[in-house]
Each structure stands twice: as C-alpha cells, then as structure tokens.
Amino acid sequence: KVAPTNGVYFGPYLRYTNMDIERGIWLGSILLVTDAPQPPTIHIHQSIDLSPNPRQLKPVAIATHQRWTFYRYDIDLKMEESGPAKWTYAITSHLGCTRYEFLVAGRHETNWRFIATSGNDFALNVSANDRQKLGGVGYMWKDIMQKHAEIGGFHCQLGLGGQIFADRMWKEIPLLKQWLQMRGKEARKNAPWTAAHEEEVKHAYFHYYTSHFDQPYLREAWAQIPYISQVDDHDM
C-alpha cells in the first residue's frame, strides 16, 4: 500500500531553480504529492518577521498517477542586500499545519554552502539485516541535518545520481521477470510493450520514489535544504 507518513501528502520537496542576478530574486519551488480532493495550502514569510503577513503560494497540478496528483508551488523571493535570510513556509491540510525553514543567500553573497550526495540507496545484494546494522538510509541524512543546524544552514544540496536503486524492479515486477526469462535476443526484442507493462512499471517507480524520500531525516532534509538533482542509470 502506498501511503505517506503524515497521512496526507508526500513531500514537501524544496527545489532550488535559479537566481535572477539582475533583480536579486531567488527562484525555487515546492512539490507535494497527494490524493486529497484539494491541494494543501502553503504560506511563506521571512522567519525574522514576528508579525508576518505571509504570502500564499499557488498550487499548479503538473502530473497525476492513479489517484495521486503532483502539485508544484513556485517561489520567488527577494534576496536581502545585507546578507542571508531564513524563510519559513507552512503547509496546511485537513490534518493540521506543519512548518519548515530554509536559508536564502544574500544578494551579494558568494560563499554559498553546498553539499553533494550520490549512491543514497542500498544495492540489491545488501540484506535487510545488514541495512539495519548500518543504520538504514536515514543514517547519513541524520548527520547532514545535524551539520545543517550547527553551521546555520546549507544553501543548496546537489543530488547526484543513484538517489534510489531502481534495479530492484527486474526482480520485483512479474511482467519484467517474465521478459528476462524469454529465450533468445530476438524474442525479447520483439516482445510487445503493453498497457499492463506501462502501468506496473509506472507504479513501481512511484512507489520506489515516494517511499524512499519519505524516510526519517531524508524527508526533513529535502524539505529544508533546497535541492538540484540529476539522474543516472540506477535512478531509472
């Protein structure tokens, strides 16, 4: 069963998109994935503002999978002339409100603090027992979040390839296992790709990504450290 930890949505995933150097504008977005009839509302304000007049972000539906809808909330923030600033966004759904904070560099700041990660999943040959002994996927992200708090925040994280190892689908999806068992290259080459194949593979990807990024510490990191990501063969 695919279900988010908070019972309402997967995410948030806070993305750094770019910055408008001429105007001093930080550009990003927040992604939420939900099966609720209405998208959650998101308000954003500068953290230091003790009597905030938060701005509401507009949800845009960008994709669907079965009963789930992907909503993107675009962000544009004025970068401060005096230096870095922390911003808070609050997500409100029928189950309540959750707040997250992130760091935006000053307009003239050049010493951004980055982290880069890759290979953030376990290979197929690592047993569940060994994964547990190593602290699971979240062990590294716990360390990252501790460092994030100690230094006053990372400005951005670079998600390199191997955020998940989707190789597992060849062992877990019956239709793909059947294809691998076909004798002869020509037979495999000429095998039809059916609607059933499409749906099973799409749902596997959906499950792999949503469950992976919904794990403790990893979930918090991707909500509070703006990311830029790329993929490699493992992610696909």
Locate the predicted segments by residue.
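Extended recognition/assembly regions associated with phosphoester-bond processing machinery
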Residues: K1-M236
